[in-house]
């Protein structure tokens, strides 16, 4: 029997459905259907959890089968996570969070430069930190720095730690798609009564105002309304959240209905409860995770408020991570009064560090690291710093080349463009570029001074906008200025409103301008695109409808900076511009956006 080649995968899932005439609504040959049923629920392939670990009280080979992984000296358990848990193995999923590195680095910098020891585990609860969060001043803060989170914070108004636990769990695809966000906020602000589908749900849903958010609540709901044991409730959570647990789910469903009937819950109420629990199981976030994440939210917020220079330096050293680019982080630092300085061969370490600066907020400036220069890499940057610590400062560019033989001409040119030879050698950037080309020919196998004696001609210094362009190209950060500030006079003549004036200006239609930092089109937004613009005074939220995107698609999708005319909206402390017209804005090159779905 020859089976025609085609894809029946979607039909197999509904193979038991019949049409009006009683015949199956598919054309799957019986042999294919029979074979599909035989392999149903079998593992499709073997996979390894990238951060999964188990702990056992004896050699694990005595408990479950083990095989060697492809990585040297790495062993892999042949059971899946559910079987490991059922056998009593303690299972951990290790998350790689860049914010942990950023916090570690910030605490180390505070200890090194101020002699103060910060224990993140014992940070005091601070009303000023929560006030900062209510203003959505959260660029760089863990988990709540996205556009959606920043738009929610002024409405949620977090004033205690558990509010952050809810915030972390609330702004996720599941609660958004499940319609939980707006009801929770309305109930929190007293705009909607707190209700429960059944009085027995108050015990499990009371702390989240009747809105289910956490997986633990699903388990407590089963215990309260159906008399499940904790073990049965956990099985229900696993079965509801798995696409491969239909048989187990059907068994637990009968148990759930029996338990509800014993407590007088029958008919439509029982069906609604089951449907609500089944829908919620697909997106419920573990409360334990949310609490852990919320503490990182608070710790990063506390550091941003009380140790801003160390906070920004820690973030810059942990890149790439988070929602915002290094340039946006540096601009946010400037808006908070923190001085950010370009890297310097004599003053910088491999990574960003702190320098005493009375003019900077908190008394310290951020000095960018040598490793921030494009194409240099951490290994070369660390070698440059280590060589300087061991044998003293570099005398000139030729001395650098002779002591760091692996450095290349493109790397020297990037360092010159980024201003690394300015403060230490007193060289203008164009002069440094000239000298770098000559010095690159000096190596340890040649006599000193033979190649680099060429005297650079008198070259003009760079204009401020040229310095900003050079910084953006060399390091991705322009500490001395934002691209829009060099256009501000022309933008003012056009009536363009700055970001800081949008909260108070008396107008319904405005022009705004800025560099595009983000473009987002979430699956939950029905085609609406959200953009962030940044000018020298702050951030601007742009909402682009489907129709507007179609009209201005090439500009909206490809321009590095935009002029936007739109309707000004101010709702519960959140300011948005609903775009009606877009045109490209020519600014300093080198600024790129981060685009997400």
For each feature predicted by the language model, list its residue ranges:
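Single conserved hydrophobic/aromatic residue that forms the stacking wall/gate
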Residues: 1-12
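Noncatalytic, beta-rich nucleic-acid-contacting surfaces in large DNA/RNA-processing enzymes
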Residues: 10-597
């Amino acid at each position: 029997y020859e089976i025609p080649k085609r894809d029946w995968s979607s039909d197999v899932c509904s193979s038991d459905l019949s049409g009006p005439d009683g015949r199956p609504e598919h054309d799957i040959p019986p042999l294919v259907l029979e074979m599909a049923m035989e392999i149903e629920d079998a593992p499709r392939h073997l996979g390894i959890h990238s951060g999964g670990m188990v702990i056992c009280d004896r050699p694990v080979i005595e408990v479950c089968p083990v095989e060697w992984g492809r990585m040297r000296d790495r062993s892999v358990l042949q059971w899946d996570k559910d079987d490991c848990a059922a056998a009593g193995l303690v299972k951990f999923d290790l998350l790689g969070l860049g914010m942990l590195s950023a916090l570690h680095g910030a605490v180390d910098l505070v200890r090194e430069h101020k002699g103060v020891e910060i224990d993140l585990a014992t940070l005091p609860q601070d009303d000023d930190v929560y006030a900062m969060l209510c203003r959505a001043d959260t660029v760089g803060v863990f988990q709540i720095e996205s556009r959606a989170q920043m738009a929610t914070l002024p409405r949620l108004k977090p004033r205690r730690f558990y509010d952050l636990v809810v915030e972390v769990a609330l702004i996720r695809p599941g609660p958004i798609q499940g319609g939980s966000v707006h009801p929770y906020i309305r109930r929190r602000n007293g705009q909607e009564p707190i209700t429960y589908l059944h009085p027995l749900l108050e015990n499990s849903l009371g702390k989240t105002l009747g809105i289910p958010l956490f997986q633990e609540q699903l388990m407590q709901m089963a215990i309260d309304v159906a008399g499940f044991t904790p073990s049965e409730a956990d099985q229900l959570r696993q079965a509801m959240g798995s696409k491969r647990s239909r048989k187990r789910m059907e068994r637990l469903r009968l148990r759930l209905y029996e338990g509800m009937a014993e407590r007088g819950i029958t008919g439509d109420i029982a069906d609604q409860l089951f449907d609500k629990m089944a829908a919620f199981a697909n997106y419920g976030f573990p409360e334990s995770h949310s609490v852990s994440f919320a503490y990182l939210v608070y710790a990063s917020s506390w550091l941003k408020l009380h140790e801003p220079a160390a906070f920004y330096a820690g973030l810059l050293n942990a890149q790439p991570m988070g929602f915002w680019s290094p340039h946006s982080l540096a601009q946010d630092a400037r808006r908070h009064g923190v001085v950010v300085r370009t890297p310097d061969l004599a003053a910088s370490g491999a990574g960003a560090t702190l320098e005493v600066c009375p003019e900077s907020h908190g008394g310290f400036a951020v000095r960018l690291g040598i490793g921030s220069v494009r194409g240099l890499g951490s290994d070369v940057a660390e070698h440059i710093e280590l060589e300087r610590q061991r044998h003293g400062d570099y005398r000139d560019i030729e001395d650098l080349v002779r002591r760091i033989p692996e450095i290349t001409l493109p790397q020297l040119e990037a360092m010159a463009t980024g201003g690394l030879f300015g403060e230490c050698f007193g060289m203008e950037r164009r002069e440094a570029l000239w000298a770098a080309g000559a010095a690159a020919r000096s190596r340890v196998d040649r006599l000193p001074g033979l190649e680099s004696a060429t005297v650079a001609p008198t070259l003009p210094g760079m204009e401020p906008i040229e310095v900003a362009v050079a910084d953006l190209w060399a390091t991705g950060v322009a500490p001395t200025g934002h691209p829009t500030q060099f256009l501000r006079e022309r933008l003012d003549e056009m009536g363009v409103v700055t970001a800081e004036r949008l909260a108070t200006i008396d107008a319904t239609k405005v022009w705004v301008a800025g560099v595009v930092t983000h473009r987002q089109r979430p699956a939950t937004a029905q085609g609406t695109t959200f953009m962030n613009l940044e000018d020298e005074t702050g951030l601007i939220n742009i909402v682009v409808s489907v129709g507007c995107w179609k009209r201005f698609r090439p500009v909206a999708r490809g321009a590095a900076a935009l002029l936007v005319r739109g309707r000004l909206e101010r709702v519960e402390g959140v300011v948005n511009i609903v775009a009606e017209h877009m045109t490209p804005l020519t600014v300093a090159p080198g600024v790129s956006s981060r685009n997400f779905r």
